[in-house]
Amino acid sequence: MFIINLLLYIVPILLAVAFLTLVERKVLGYMQFRKGPNIVGPYGLLQPIADGIKLFTKEPLRPLTSSVSMFIIAPILALTLALTIWTPLPMPHTLIDLNLGLLFILSLSGLSVYSILWSGWASNSKYALIGALRAVAQTISYEVTLAIILLSIMLINGSFTLKNLLITQENMWLIVSTWPLAMMWYISTLAETNRAPFDLTEGESELVSGFNVEYAAGPFAMFFLAEYANIMAMNAMTAILFLGSSLNHNFSHLSTLSFMLKTLFLTFMFLWIRASYPRFRYDQLMYLLWKNFLPLTLALCLWFISIPIALSCIPPQI
């Protein structure tokens, strides 16, 4: 029974990820005054299936000088972590109900750094290694602000449990009272998932494709699926943290629909930002985090610690 539950959880995520690539190409196409994919199937709807078949039936090539085991393990690890992040998310029911759900997600997003580093190092290519080092530095840096923002949310919530966030936001979304945190969280998730305007890891003009430049066929598809699964997971997290369900829990179907619509809207914003903004310089990226976001998040964290204590309204410890 657990295997069936697992498949019912993983297959829709992979399908959503596949069609997200189509939505991205369509959105970017229309924003650049062109059609996007429109040949394979009606309105190009079968394009992701054609892409998947093409990638998984090709011969997986690897450089002669690469480290074989690490080269193969890296994409598998990336996809496994990207799918595991979804397990504690309440939609409104979870696959695994964890007391420390927020910490679990944070630690898994930290582990994804290893798959990037291994892929860059195992490829034995200078472009892949430079892309991997950039990605690791960027991901580790922005995890600092993500962790502090999560700590602030936990102080308001009174617990690390994700389901408790839905109860906290029954009357009012947290984005209303914590909009500076929400803004910094959203920008940090863009950097964490290596999306435009922070896609310095795969700068086409300098690094061709970044850390996965030597990958082809199935392993490349795994990295691709992992990247888009992470994007959707981060947007699902944003929806839970700041736009939590304000519906009655007796109507779980409506709650799920509301949650998915919020996630889709946030994902569409990712695509809109990609079409609108040019890439940051690397020094600007780091300056934004260490000089702007970090002091602000620390100050707001202190604010959320001191105000409940000063007003004697400490949140309930569940």
Swiss-Prot record:
The keyword Membrane applies. Its EC number is 7.1.1.2. GO terms for biological process: mitochondrial electron transport, NADH to ubiquinone; mitochondrial respiratory chain complex I assembly. The chain crosses the membrane at residues 2-22, 70-90, 100-120, 136-156, 172-192, 223-243, 253-273, 294-314. It comes from the Eukaryota. GO terms for molecular function: NADH dehydrogenase (ubiquinone) activity. It is found in: Mitochondrion inner membrane. It catalyses: a ubiquinone + NADH + 5 H(+)(in) = a ubiquinol + NAD(+) + 4 H(+)(out). Keywords: Electron transport, Membrane, Mitochondrion, Mitochondrion inner membrane, NAD, Respiratory chain, Translocase, Transmembrane, Transmembrane helix, Transport, Ubiquinone. The keyword Kinase does not apply. Its main location: mitochondrion. GO terms for cellular component: mitochondrial inner membrane. PANTHER family: NADH DEHYDROGENASE SUBUNIT 1 (PTHR11432), NADH-UBIQUINONE OXIDOREDUCTASE CHAIN 1 (PTHR11432:SF3). HAMAP family: NDH1_NuoH (MF_01350). Core subunit of respiratory chain NADH dehydrogenase (Complex I) which is composed of 45 different subunits. Belongs to the complex I subunit 1 family. Core subunit of the mitochondrial membrane respiratory chain NADH dehydrogenase (Complex I) which catalyzes electron transfer from NADH through the respiratory chain, using ubiquinone as an electron acceptor. Essential for the catalytic activity and assembly of complex I. This is NADH-ubiquinone oxidoreductase chain 1.
